[in-house]
A protein has these predicted regions:
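Anionic-ligand binding patches
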Residues: 2-4, 10-199
Length: 199
């Protein structure tokens, strides 16, 4: 099936495309279709924002559309940055500034209290309005410093996934305390919030 990916985020597009194409779908980005709309994320939940994005871009493209709204929820910050993850620093899409703010807000939080989870809501919608939203999570913790790697985007250098359990894919790589940014794309997809939502 040919699916429009409703995102302007290059990292998210890479992951959506990689996961969906492995399932046999053809993915075209909204940019490739000439759609420059950036739906306003006014929802208070990941699922509400995913639906807003999916509906808007589906109407503009006339195609089956998939949208993801995701973020990092930190226990010590009462779930923040949550739905505001992409604009935690005050403006949208500045990964460095968002990471800086998270590290600053976590500077006095001890190792045993740094629990967090990545959450993803993925909404698939057809031009007739029928839609389905699936949720995925990955538990872990916030690192004390950036654990940069060759992969990832957003908060990936600061998030260390837990070693326990398996994702919906049934696969579990040995993450060995590595951050999302240090995992290969296949390793991350096997356990990630987005991989779980799309499984």
């Amino acid at each position: 099936m040919k699916i429009c990916a409703a995102t302007g985020n290059a990292g998210k597009l890479r992951e959506l495309r990689r996961i969906l194409e492995a399932q046999g779908h053809e993915v075209v980005s909204q940019k490739e279709l000439g759609i420059t709309l950036e739906p306003e994320e006014t929802g208070t939940t990941f699922a509400a924002n995913a639906l807003i994005k999916a509906e808007t871009i589906c109407k503009a493209s006339g195609m089956a559309t998939i949208a993801d709204d995701s973020g990092l929820c930190v226990d010590a910050l009462e779930g923040a940055p949550g739905v505001y993850s992409a604009r935690y620093c005050g403006h949208h899409g500045d990964d460095e500034a968002n990471n800086d703010k998270l590290l600053e807000n976590m500077k006095d939080v001890p190792a045993g209290k740094r629990g967090a989870k990545f959450v993803s809501a993925v909404c698939f919608i057809l031009p007739d309005g029928k839609h389905l939203t699936c949720m995925g999570e990955c538990p872990g913790k916030v690192a004390f410093e950036r654990l940069a790697g060759d992969y990832g985007f957003g908060y990936d250098p600061l998030f260390i996934p837990d070693e326990c359990g398996v994702g919906k894919t049934g696969k579990r790589p040995n993450t060995e305390g590595r951050s999302y940014a240090q995992l290969t794309p296949d390793e991350k997809d096997a356990i990630s919030h987005r991989g779980n939502a799309l499984a």
